[in-house]
Amino acid sequence: MDAKLQRVLMKDALNENFDETEEGIFFPKHGFMLSGEYMDRVNGGEATFTKNLIPKEALIHVLNVAIGSKAKPAGSYLALFNGATAPADNWTAANFAATAGEIVSLTEGYTNATRPQFIPSDSTDQKYIDNFGSVASVTIATTSQVNVTGVALLTNNQRG
């Protein structure tokens, strides 16, 4: 990607000159689409795939790290949540835990003391990255039932 396109995509993201579509985030001036999905499975069962919502703060972060001058964070971590509120474009790192209803209990949630790390492999000839080489997992602990309504990718490993 050339430097000029990098600058205009960054400017358009900061000025909210993009469209959120079912397929992802589309920059209409440039014909550029940013999208993703996540895969999950329970107890090694059938895999399910779900489209990702990329909130504004996350999009700006991706652009700053990938084509801007911001340093890549030390790690990425998965945060499970069970709130009834659907993920939204205005979710941020600062409001995530309360808004999403992050699962923080070690006895009625999952037993990891911190959020599990997401360790992706670099893309080689594909247009995506995955963590199949180092799959993140959690052990659920509950006396009844835990509902997980979503998973977020964050740069801090501390729960809540």
Residue ranges and their predicted role:
Residues 1-150, 155-160:
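Small cysteine-rich, disulfide-bonded extracellular modules of the LU/uPAR three-finger superfamily
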